[in-house]
Amino acid sequence: MESSIFKPSSMDLIRAGLQDLDKARALFDQLKADDIPDERCAELLSALAHACDPDMALSNFVDIVNAMQSSQRDLEHVIPDNDALKRLVTVLGVSDAMGKFMRFKPQLVEAAAVDNCNSHLFNHAQRRARLLKAVGADPDEPAMPVASKDLAEAATALRSSYRNQLAAIIAQDAVADDPTSIQPTISRELSDLADAALEGALAIARHETEGSEHVRFTIIGMGKLGAQELNYVSDVDLIYVVEPADKDVDHQTLIRVGTKMGTMLQRVCQSAIMGVAEQPLWQIDGGLRPEGKDGALVRVLSSHKNYYEQWAENWEFQALLKARPVAGDPDLGQAYMDMTRPFVWSASKRKNFVYDCQKMRKRVEDLIPAPLKDREIKLGRGGLRDVEFTVQMLQLVHGRTDESLRTSNTLDSLQRLSEGGYVSRKQAVRMSQDYRFERVMEHRQQIWSLKRTHLFPDLGRASVGGLEKKRDIDVDELNQNQELRRLARAFGLHPEELVDKYDDTRREVRHLHLDIYYRPMLPVNAQMENDQIVLSVEAAQERFESIGFGDPDAAIRHVQALTAGVGRAAKINRIILPAVLQWLGEGQNPDMGLLNWRKLEENFGTESGYLGFLRDSTSAAQRLCHILSNSRFLGDALNKSVESISWLGDDDNLQARTREALDVQTGSALERFGSNINEFATSMRAMRRHEIERIGLSWMSGVISDSDSLKAMTDVYDAIIDASLTWAVRHQIAEFGVETAPAGITVIAMGRYGGREVNFSSDADAILIYRPADDADDGQANAFAKKVVEDLRNILQGPTTLEPKIELDLDLRPEGKNGPLVRSYASCEEYYESWASTWERQALLRARYAAGDAELARDFLINIADPLRYPTTELTEAELQNIRKLKARMEAERLPRGVRRERHLKLGKGGLSDVEWTVQLMQLQHAGDIKDLRVNGTLEALDVLEAKKLISAIDAIQLRKAWTLCTAARNGSYLWSGRANQADILPDDIYSLGGIAVYLGYGAHRGQHFENDLLAVMRKCRDVCQRLFYGKTEGEAAAATTATASAATQQPQTAPRPRMHVIAPRLERNRRRAQR
């Protein structure tokens, strides 16, 4: 009777998972032509159903059969039974690269199919022994085994033996019914194999390096290798430690020989070697050693200790958590561990430890290219690094006092945290499952091509999303994605099911981080789940302290108060406080932030719906926490107007209001409070407070830029002053009993107000001018103008309301404080024509129309100001010297007592005054000829000076940078402290500097970095000022910039000096009297 002929139907092939049916039939026909029995072909078809990529597995299997027949090897010996066939086919279905290796290396086929020596069951010692024997070294030598083969032969044997064991591990992994359950075992076996390979490479290095017998050498594994959770293909993080093997070895020789040994072992592992056909194993990364890649390759133990005592950054102690001796001298390795463990377990007490580690994690996330953010299994949000980070932070915070937590492996540590009561059992199980699932995905992606990767398959347009927003998924496209299909089959899932599971896992990991680290910080009555753990008092204090709270006991009391009771506010707080605590911890002053959060709830929690809004708007809640923990001024402001919180949820609400919108509001107030100065003043000042608050919130939230915030605040001042002047004019028309105003009155903005550079703590510098109406006499016009100004000042800064004053500073008027508050146009014309000094001409560069009679302002600016500020003749040398002397005197007189020159943002070396006086001097020199220079703003004028080649691009950059940074620092200082009188002074303490630095884009607790950067910019600016303003040469400017402050400025002052723009008019009057 004829035996049955193997001829699979299309349905048979489809059931086996094959997709290219024509190619599959052709390959089976080829096997039959090669005399492969039908029974074996049927077994092969059955085995393909278990392969992740049946088509590639079949293709590689046929190629292997052809290669073995060409070399006349017995296929039945290599693949003796159906189990061996299944193991081989499964490996070919998960690793195309291994399949291609097997064509030329039959020993790999045997290792994967039968593994006669059961290498997949080897323990650490057995793997070490196998690889040491491969290089001809004695495995019984514990500290210094030496290879006996030459370099090429030993490296070939080492790499070949490594890959044989790797093939057996892949087979063990691939055939597992549940790859997630076996993942920890696989990672440990891969780590043991890497340890053994390093031991073998070190033995080769000893053989190749003269004098190696005098050097004790140990290899410290870091990262995944140190934690025994290595991937299939990964950089191996290593640190090398050396010590002399005998007393006769000097330090220089020790380091020289040790460096040669380290270089050679790295070459064996990662480089091409003449005469070695086997490919390298993996790359070695020495970036975690002291000083990173710039540091010495090898160091003695004491050098390591000195570095960690004096120079190491916080993240380096976190990295040391996973350190483990993996090869070399075991006693020296243990000595390294004994030396570093105290550093690791005291790290959480280091300043800003958790914050710095969090920022490092955030920085890694931010560096991921946008198209890859949702494909990053390892580094992305909700990825493996998030799990590891959560576990490590808990270990480092609580392991200081709980020695049971002192482990390096992520899953082992998670189990210890659960047993210790720091993580609930349910949370530990969920996080363990998530971690193992993501790690298996990473492994399978690496196995396929045996290349380093940790990316989820490319889904095209569906690659973006999965966390905050849904993916744009087409199921048909997913099913056609071969890479996704192969990965999904590893878990027994359909492609769309794998995508859903991946996204669900990432979301759960992010949620668990909050639940595990922050929710236990809430009291027992605030827990949301039955099995939620409750920290002991000591553990809670450690947890609060670790995220930056300076007074953890007070923080605990605040949280208890916020979550107590059955009210709506308490219920919402129980939901959102874990996230709130995390966000507050990212600020410079978490204690202030939590206190402000509690004040908001006490003031408005029962009446306002703001907490419900924050629960529903994550972005608004996060912005609010950033503001409360970084701004005393805005925290106080929000406690007066809680409705402002709603702006944080919509960027449109945070945009600065246009002048037209401001005028509509002031017009409404004019109509409503036209007869009541108190109510009108209250409305104007409240409007100013409200709008400055909006601008501050917007600036802190990154919605508007630095320059836009200055212009927006200027618009607020213009609108309010214009409305206030209108109210005063109307009121005095009624008081005088006339139908029309006897005089037109205008407000000329001066100083930074004139330059549209109003900051959060600015006064409004101005000049007030009136001109009699055609039918009015001078006396009546003067009396009317004085009364109007009296009303105007009462509205803005009088004691008519409890709202903060709007300071209208009139000291820049003719004759300063001794001159009349409001002056007639004719008097101004006479004064400026006859008595104006050089500094007054310079001050007029900022003059612009702000409010009131626009025609009067135009006449003043064109007929009086322009000829003085835009002269057609050059400044004389005497005028130049006068300006320079006046600047020096002004800074010396106005600098507050005890403040060093380099720390005053306005008057200090390289501060605002240097930039503004330099720019204004050049305007006085050139604006008569260059109309584009006739602008009021500092940066506008600087741009023109650069464009017209009157100043070099390099100098312009330095001046612009200094002005921008100093202006932002002044604003930041005011918002941080709420103290206007300190806004110009750069504080000495690093903590306050850190509060200001946040506003300039630095992270919290970066005060030292900010100070160094700012002072460097100011020094460069001062150098430019010395050349352009004082006329010094480059050498003279450099010397002056680095010189110490003069003795005069260092002498203690007995009393504060008056402002220079007040002194200058007085000096001018004295000069005139002397002339008369």
UniProtKB/Swiss-Prot annotation:
Could you say which cofactors this protein requires?
Answer: Mg(2+)
The encoding gene = glnE
Matching InterPro entries, A to Z?
GlnE, GlnE_rpt_dom, NT_sf, PII_UdlTrfase/GS_AdlTrfase
Alphabetical UniProt keywords? ATP-binding, Magnesium, Multifunctional enzyme, Nucleotide-binding, Nucleotidyltransferase, Transferase
Broad EC category: transferase
Q: Where is this region: Adenylyl transferase?
A: 524-1076
Residue ranges under compositional bias (Low complexity)?
1042-1056
Pfam families with a match to the protein in the record: GlnD_UR_UTase, GlnE
| EC identifiers of the protein | 2.7.7.89, 2.7.7.42
Q: What is the name of the protein in this document?
A: Bifunctional glutamine synthetase adenylyltransferase/adenylyl-removing enzyme
Catalyses which reaction(s): [glutamine synthetase]-O(4)-(5'-adenylyl)-L-tyrosine + phosphate = [glutamine synthetase]-L-tyrosine + ADP; [glutamine synthetase]-L-tyrosine + ATP = [glutamine synthetase]-O(4)-(5'-adenylyl)-L-tyrosine + diphosphate
Q: Where is this region: Disordered?
A: 1042-1076
